[in-house]
């Protein structure tokens, strides 16, 4: 792979706006950034759960604040990487133009990476997967089950449903501003946010690039268009490795910080989590010793302040620097598309990551409030699927008369934007493809909901409000 192509700043449709070079000096990627920030889908992230249930408190992260943190960390890592590549002469073909573009692309990808997630955090994704596994074989269309009618790839798209794959749909199709190109972002930005460049038929948890579904069957031509333009093809875009690290660092730090602020975990428990690991490597030892020093130095201060200082001044830096060491050491393999690991897991910070993850799992993810929120979210999403999937089965079919009056009324609740997108993509397609697209219409609708809207709609449809 070559940076000239990987950083392709062209768009699927050339911008229809004529800009004067004297008055608009924005780069294509700065323009991407502005389009994302000003989009409704980005704003909706403020009402989507990160980990803790949404509340009026101003410190608990939402998807919006998480995405902004990922964007900031990713951009910072981009600046560090471009500086080192040039200083250490890791790539003779690397130019200043490449160096200027990379941080901007990563900033955009950080904002985008969670834009396809359904309500109620990652548990919402699992709720969708679980519902389709349980129900595709029982719902019928013309006396045959959907599991019999759909192709293997169509079925696997729902069995392996993934919010990251949904990002492509949101920004390139569902954001129907002027035409079918959505936000019409650059090829480089779109490619950087594709974490898994594989279809649902090629999911392989042993391979870093194919751990999860990367794009839906309905978006295969879009995926091919993007990866052909960047010449990444079925390889992972090099910047995706950096985006992944930024995401990991943001949630590892934020979950622990928010947990301390909410009184779910304290410094004594964090130190104990470190002490339960018998042999510390240098990275782990440095972080452990630093927390002990800070807790002694700031004795009497709020624990949330001490942990916040520790995470910001010590942990985050270790995770970033150790991950980037792996990026530099494996630069050629990454550029060749053969590196099969996450940067953070392959680094000397892996032990630290395992401790932080263990602390979060033990104290935070098992918290009663989080568990209750996840169970409620599962109930809401499952019920919405149970309600809307049967309602769309005979919509735009060869036998529309089989739609009930209730089905037709339910369809009026789906926005004209989603229905218009469906009609555009279903035009001229086979009956099976249309049926598949109608199922996607419902998942598109649900993934576009905020937590509050999903909860409110569920309550109204079930006579609870």
Swiss-Prot record:
One Pfam family, short name: HD
Record InterPro entries: dGTP_triP_hydro_central_sf (IPR023293), dGTP_triphosphohydrolase_C (IPR027432), dGTPase (IPR006261), dGTPase-like (IPR050135), dNTPase_3 (IPR023024), HD/PDEase_dom (IPR003607), HD_domain (IPR006674)
Domain of life according to the entry: Bacteria
Alphabetical list of Gene3D superfamilies matching this protein: eoxyguanosinetriphosphate triphosphohydrolase domain-like, Hypothetical protein af1432, putative deoxyguanosinetriphosphate triphosphohydrolase like domain
UniProt-recorded Gene Ontology molecular function terms: dGTPase activity
Keyword annotations: Hydrolase
PROSITE patterns for the chain: HD
Family: Belongs to the dGTPase family. Type 3 subfamily.
Protein's name in the database: Deoxyguanosinetriphosphate triphosphohydrolase-like protein
Highest classification ranks of the organism: Bacteria, Bacillati, Bacillota, Bacilli, Bacillales
């Amino acid at each position: 792979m070559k940076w000239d192509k990987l950083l392709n700043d062209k768009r699927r449709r050339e911008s229809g706006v004529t800009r004067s070079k004297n008055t608009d000096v924005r780069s294509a990627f700065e323009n991407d950034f502005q389009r994302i920030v000003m989009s409704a889908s980005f704003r909706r992230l403020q009402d989507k759960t990160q980990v803790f249930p949404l509340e009026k408190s101003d410190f608990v992260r939402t998807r919006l604040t998480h995405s902004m943190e990922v964007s900031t960390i990713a951009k910072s890592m981009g600046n560090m990487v471009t500086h080192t590549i040039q200083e250490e002469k890791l790539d003779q073909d690397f130019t200043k133009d490449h160096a200027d573009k990379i941080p901007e692309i990563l900033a955009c990808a950080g904002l985008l990476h969670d834009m396809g997630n359904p309500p109620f955090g990652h548990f919402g994704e699992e709720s969708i997967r679980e519902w389709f596994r349980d129900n595709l074989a029982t719902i019928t269309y013309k006396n045959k089950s959907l599991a019999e009618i759909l192709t293997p790839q169509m079925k696997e798209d729902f069995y392996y449903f993934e919010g990251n794959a949904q990002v492509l749909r949101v920004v390139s199709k569902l954001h129907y501003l002027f035409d079918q190109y959505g936000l019409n972002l650059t090829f480089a930005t779109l490619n950087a946010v594709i974490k898994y460049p594989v279809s649902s038929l090629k999911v392989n948890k042993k391979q870093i690039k194919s751990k999860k579904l990367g794009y839906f069957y309905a978006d295969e031509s879009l995926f091919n268009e993007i990866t052909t333009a960047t010449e990444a093809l079925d390889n992972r875009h090099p910047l995706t490795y950096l985006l992944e690290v930024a995401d990991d660092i943001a949630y590892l730090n934020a979950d622990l910080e928010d947990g301390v602020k909410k009184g779910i975990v304290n410094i004594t428990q964090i130190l104990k989590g470190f002490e339960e690991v018998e042999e510390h490597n240098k990275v782990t030892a440095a972080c452990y010793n630093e927390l002990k020093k800070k807790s002694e130095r700031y004795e009497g201060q709020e624990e949330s302040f001490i942990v916040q200082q520790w995470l910001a001044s010590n942990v985050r830096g270790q995770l970033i620097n150790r991950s980037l060491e792996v990026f530099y050491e494996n630069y050629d393999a990454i550029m060749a598309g053969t590196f099969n690991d996450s940067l953070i897991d392959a680094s000397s910070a892996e032990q630290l990551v395992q401790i932080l993850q263990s602390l979060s799992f033990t104290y935070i993810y098992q918290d009663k409030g989080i568990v209750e929120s996840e169970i409620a979210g599962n109930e809401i999403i499952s019920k919405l699927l149970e309600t809307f999937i049967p309602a769309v089965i005979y919509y735009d079919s060869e036998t529309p008369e089989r739609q009930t009056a209730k089905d037709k009324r339910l369809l009026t609740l789906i926005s004209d934007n989603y229905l218009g997108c469906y009609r555009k993509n279903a035009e001229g397609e086979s009956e099976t493809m249309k049926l598949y697209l109608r199922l996607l219409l419902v998942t598109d609708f649900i993934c576009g909901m905020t937590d509050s809207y999903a909860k409110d709609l569920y309550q109204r449809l079930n006579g609870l409000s």
